[in-house]
Amino acid sequence: MKSSVEKLSATRTKLTIEVPFEELKPEFDKAYATLAQQVNMPGFRKGKVPAKILEARLGRGVVLDQVINEMLPSRYSQAVEENDVKALGQPEIEIAELEDGKHITFTAEVDVRPEIEVPDFSAISVEVAPLKADDEAIDAELKNLQARFGTLKPADRAVKKGDFVSIDLSATIDGETVDEATTEGLSHEVGNDSLIEGLDDALVGMKEGEESTFTSKLVAGEHADEEAEVTVKLGSVKERELPELDDDFAQLASEFDTLDELKESLKGQVEQQLKNTQAGEIRDKVLAEALEQTEFELPEGVVKEQVDAQIQQIIQQFGGDEKVFESMLAAQDMTREKFEEDARSSAEDSVRTQLFLDAVADKEQPEVSQEELMDHIAFTANQYGMDPNQFIMQLQQAGQLGSLFADVRRGKALALNIARTSVKDTDGADVDPKEYFGDVEAEGDKADKAETDKAEEKPKKAPAKKSTTKKSTAKKSTAKKSTAKKSTAKKSTAKKSTTKKATKSTAKKSTAKKTTAKKAAEKKED
């Protein structure tokens, strides 16, 4: 086999591949075997029809088509590897020449990674918010904990903010009932504005058994963002009775004996949360600055695929009905063109970030251990509420394990470079990025999760260790996840809070074009 490469642009390459017939015996054997299974001929068992008889029956062209389809993926992959082509997505393939008995020549155009010059991260300086665990933040955490241990008691009075109510809801548009907006016995905390605009205002002042009607936009379903007449009927009213904030409460809600000890632990948790936030801010600002200093073209096929994926994902949310999608856009006074423009902007940002992080990883060449990969898989599985083992099986079936490996590799490479930057807070104090992202010289740095969830359990007496966590990607708005928000910081060593669960808690429980030309290769080349 012979192959050559022609650079069409910074992000597009054309391969020309010539395969002599003497190399195609395995493909011919497989083609004959496949076709023999599809033909029934008197005097021959199924699958045992000789090659010459098959050609006489089906025609030489059918056999050659089968051979070409068998040959294209492997020969294309071989040419990509031999020529060190950094291909993205599937190629567009055309048969350029076919001389039966001599050779087959085909071309493959494919998007490729552009050449990217990674900037000097040691020259990057960013400014972030300072760490201030003030009394107000600590009191807010204490009140949240107190609310979790509150009890609900019936209130024989008009509704006020902070009450918990049971309500029936119904809605009409132009006199027609909206079935999907009808519900009974719905529990709701008045004042949290979690349901529909105008509901809390309507509820305040109502008494049990009363009804009120107001106008609001529906927030979901087929009539999302449409104006509707909403009727709410109040079933019951309950108020939350909070426990006294004293030593007894500390013993009830935590492992501590005194309220002062509990407050000290909560202070540590607030500081931990602030550190997590600061680590995420450092990462985002450093990455944004590095991208600002780097210019490169984007492969159009990759961008287009992400745009199409975003649109198809949203349409699927409406049951695959494109008319409903169009109605949703109309209700928001948005045209299809404007939506696609916004989707393209998002896709370009995603592709630009991923390609840049790939370039950083190629430059740093960080090693990814099995433990690091498994940690990342477990974290991602948790984000989807899945069992890690089940998640791994799905990844293997979809051939996506390599994608998560690449995520960890990008994260480690970026973490190493963030550690080289200069960081100050807005008060002028130096911030050491190594505290979050590890030492530049330490190849064993962990690239794990960002932004640890708030502690939901009982605080331990041991103070929380310093956070080294980082931000996670979770956008689901696109079919292909952006790696812009992948983890880059060291694995958190902060101990989990062990706050007791309240038994009477009142807390409310979118890579490349898939258009292949004639007899295109069906294997994707990453």
UniProtKB/Swiss-Prot annotation:
<feature type="compositionally biased region" description="Basic residues">
    <location>
        <begin position="461"/>
        <end position="517"/>
    </location>
</feature>
<dbReference type="InterPro" id="IPR001179">
    <property type="entry name" value="PPIase_FKBP_dom"/>
</dbReference>
<protein>
    <recommendedName>
        <fullName>Trigger factor</fullName>
        <ecNumber>5.2.1.8</ecNumber>
    </recommendedName>
</protein>
<dbReference type="Pfam" id="PF05697">
    <property type="entry name" value="Trigger_N"/>
</dbReference>
<dbReference type="Pfam" id="PF00254">
    <property type="entry name" value="FKBP_C"/>
</dbReference>
<dbReference type="GO" id="GO:0043022">
    <property type="term" value="F:ribosome binding"/>
</dbReference>
<dbReference type="GO" id="GO:0051301">
    <property type="term" value="P:cell division"/>
</dbReference>
<feature type="domain" description="PPIase FKBP-type">
    <location>
        <begin position="162"/>
        <end position="243"/>
    </location>
</feature>
<dbReference type="InterPro" id="IPR008880">
    <property type="entry name" value="Trigger_fac_C"/>
</dbReference>
<dbReference type="GO" id="GO:0043335">
    <property type="term" value="P:protein unfolding"/>
</dbReference>
<comment type="function">
    <text>Involved in protein export. Acts as a chaperone by maintaining the newly synthesized protein in an open conformation. Functions as a peptidyl-prolyl cis-trans isomerase.</text>
</comment>
<dbReference type="InterPro" id="IPR008881">
    <property type="entry name" value="Trigger_fac_ribosome-bd_bac"/>
</dbReference>
<dbReference type="GO" id="GO:0005737">
    <property type="term" value="C:cytoplasm"/>
</dbReference>
<dbReference type="Pfam" id="PF05698">
    <property type="entry name" value="Trigger_C"/>
</dbReference>
<keyword id="KW-0131">Cell cycle</keyword>
<keyword id="KW-0143">Chaperone</keyword>
<dbReference type="InterPro" id="IPR036611">
    <property type="entry name" value="Trigger_fac_ribosome-bd_sf"/>
</dbReference>
<comment type="similarity">
    <text>Belongs to the FKBP-type PPIase family. Tig subfamily.</text>
</comment>
<dbReference type="GO" id="GO:0003755">
    <property type="term" value="F:peptidyl-prolyl cis-trans isomerase activity"/>
</dbReference>
<dbReference type="GO" id="GO:0051083">
    <property type="term" value="P:'de novo' cotranslational protein folding"/>
</dbReference>
<dbReference type="InterPro" id="IPR046357">
    <property type="entry name" value="PPIase_dom_sf"/>
</dbReference>
<keyword id="KW-0132">Cell division</keyword>
<dbReference type="InterPro" id="IPR037041">
    <property type="entry name" value="Trigger_fac_C_sf"/>
</dbReference>
<keyword id="KW-0963">Cytoplasm</keyword>
<feature type="compositionally biased region" description="Basic and acidic residues">
    <location>
        <begin position="425"/>
        <end position="460"/>
    </location>
</feature>
<keyword id="KW-0413">Isomerase</keyword>
<dbReference type="GO" id="GO:0061077">
    <property type="term" value="P:chaperone-mediated protein folding"/>
</dbReference>
<keyword id="KW-0697">Rotamase</keyword>
<dbReference type="InterPro" id="IPR005215">
    <property type="entry name" value="Trig_fac"/>
</dbReference>
<feature type="region of interest" description="Disordered">
    <location>
        <begin position="425"/>
        <end position="526"/>
    </location>
</feature>
<dbReference type="InterPro" id="IPR027304">
    <property type="entry name" value="Trigger_fact/SurA_dom_sf"/>
</dbReference>
<dbReference type="GO" id="GO:0044183">
    <property type="term" value="F:protein folding chaperone"/>
</dbReference>
<dbReference type="GO" id="GO:0015031">
    <property type="term" value="P:protein transport"/>
</dbReference>
